[in-house]
């Protein structure tokens, strides 16, 4: 098309339905662009390198934030050195010096909603700084700022198929490089396919092959293209390019814009990728059209000094505010914004500092009388005022009150003003259903026929869709300054109906909305929604009338005496008034022509008057008019002190003066009765009030006393408050039997922390923590700890070294169990293996001399012994392999002692055993405990076969064994389960980590055992004899026992006879102590 033909006439006739490609001088379509020598370095200089921008990563279509300086450095790198591809699509350069060099086509500026309908005073922004030195900044705006974009793309960048946010149209000019566009029309089928394409994230297919038609357009340097609303397009960049463009909304594409907006809602597109303040913009557009068509103003003129953030409107640009660079030093003393102040605005990352601009030139253009206090308190702006110029300055409150009073006065005097003061504003970013509220009585609509006649059929269809969408929406975000959205939408749709009737040749019927129908009570109180004509009363006339008789029907009542002037509203009415005169049959009159009155009705006159006031104060919707009418007719008529009579055009001339005298007498009598009733009611109300006050004071006194009592009890450590009335104690009955009361608190204090539950549960076996837990501070007596001390303290350097050397993998399960073991494992009280608790610094000694020493890891486990009569039963998993018990010598005497003391019950703790015997046992060291236990078992290497999960030890098959036997020992069976405190040998590895046995008792009189000739399931099998010399050789080879804690790493080994004698001596001493 001809470039000069792109004007408003073409737009009104054809709209913007198809893409338009211009290959001509940009000035022919009203554009302003820089010279072809303009480069990205100029963009960097005009916009600023410290501006943070969002960059698209082409590989995954994700986004990355970086400064403009960083991207320019990437853009200038050679193509072969670019590891990733970055594409800048969201650099909005409005309010920067670059805006003076680039201007969109003239038609775009004329039809753009944001540029023409958005109020100038609401063009605001706030700046956020981030970085260590607050070097980088990011602007945030409170209006849809999408008019000017600078797009910088490197070669091979690709943007997949998409629709611009909220169905905005696009203007596009290529200054450098080339662009390839794939364009798909916005048909219903294509929209449906596109929605499915967006949902399939992993679909890498080319969307252009999924639709019927896909157009291709190649833009060379200097070309300009207009992309209409809703067109699905993809862009490829073959060369490094520099492009200028922008988005805009207009009236000829309302249908498509709303359809795209609904698609975004269905796809749950985030707020970040949508047009901000879309619904607020629609309200401003509708209000602008209504003002052109009817003269009604629904948007309150907003002031620049009321700006919550930094004003950046037209006056700010005229003053050159956009040429000043943004630096943190200029904003350092600004007002920091809270999250509540910016809640709901443009989403951004959490920045370190958020401030408002502090420059005086950024605000207050044409308002020199505003005080400095206003800036510091409201907007944070500072300005010095000349004393000679201004002597008195208003405060913020005074200025706001004066402004509100001016708006209220203007709204009352002008019937075309529908906005109100700032107290009626809606909360920003809050959806409200106020556009669906019922509309009360309004003044008539004055139509501007010249402007309405310019609405073309095409534009009418688009605007009707816009009005229907807003009306049907449940909740909307009402723009700031609009106080009556329901009336605004109703007027907008009324004008469109009028224009539709004109185009179709039908008669336009406009029904004015009435709040309610008028009844007698309305006429008596004077609550009119219209202004009736008035007549000046003449002094010689006996009666003054307020209305012309010809204007009202005969049934309407007139007042005889005008006591008070009726205040009427200032706005004229429109449309026919509807009256509901009462039928003559329902109005009963006496001989004088007055309605009958009854004295008993005066008793409830005050209540009925209050009800009538409440009913007429609130406006009722249209659909309740009939119900109200029935209610008013059903009520009995209640006369007022001023008498009324039925009107007639000749009724006043026929009455005599005698009638008036009788009426006056009746009036006086009734008034006196009314006054008496009022006095009686007043006196009664005073008495009620006095009684209520007394009750209230008494209640407050009781509450105060209860609070004081509670505070005193809390201060003195008392319990809850008790009732003063003592109830007789009665026995408690449960199931017909009296029971003793359950005592919650202890009778006496427990200074020794004695807990009888210790006798029932062994500490450390999984019970809950309590204040009675056994610790060294509350139950242990600190006796001499160095008794029989033959090892250093735990935690020493050598001890920690030995433990580190003994760290080995997790132990396996026991190789076999006995029949008794299986039975015990199936018992209900079997708890299984518990995690080890924290080891105390000092261990308590047990008085059970028959207890087998075990490692501290298994100290808390239940131990079981095999029955002497039951044969050992093999494990199910090892039924074909011979089972070996721990290699220990078990004599018949020892076995008898073990069988005598063993049971399947859970054994109590060491402290619990001592308590059962009535003896308090102090804490003793581990070696004392083992010495005491060793006395009851001469052969300490007995078998510890039990259902307890003890570790099994695997002999070392690769090592050689130095023994007194010529034939080497070679095990042929499963690894035997042996005690962890046995001495170390060359054929058996040590696996226990927690055992720290101080003494190894070695039996030198052992004889070798032939394992091959042993029974299949032996009770006890011992390895070849081990001598002290063999042990010394083993220790010299570096295999140290993990339980050695002295300096040289070797244990002092003594013969078994001496050890047993020593143990017996200790046991005797312990028995003596117990007996004493």
Swiss-Prot record:
Residues 935-946 have a biased composition (Low complexity). It comes from the Eukaryota. Residues 957-990, 1004-1019 have a biased composition (Polar residues). Residues 653-680, 699-714, 789-811, 1044-1056 have a biased composition (Basic and acidic residues). It is found in: Nucleus. Its main location: nucleus. Its cofactor is Fe(2+). Keywords: Chromatin regulator, Dioxygenase, Iron, Metal-binding, Nucleus, Oxidoreductase, Transcription, Transcription regulation. Disruption phenotype: RNAi-mediated knockdown introduced at L1 and young adult stages increases lifespan by 12% and 15% respectively. The keyword Hydrolase does not apply. Pfam families: Cupin_8. Residues 598-748, 789-1056 are annotated as: Disordered. Residues 681-698 have a biased composition (Basic residues). The keyword Flavoprotein does not apply. Fe cation binds at residues 162, 164, 233. GO terms for cellular component: nucleus. GO terms for molecular function: histone demethylase activity; histone H3K36me/H3K36me2 demethylase activity; metal ion binding; transcription coregulator activity. Its EC number is 1.14.11.27. Belongs to the JHDM1 histone demethylase family. The JmjC domain mediates the demethylation activity. PANTHER family: PHD/F-BOX CONTAINING PROTEIN. This is JmjC domain-containing histone demethylation protein 1. The gene is jhdm-1.
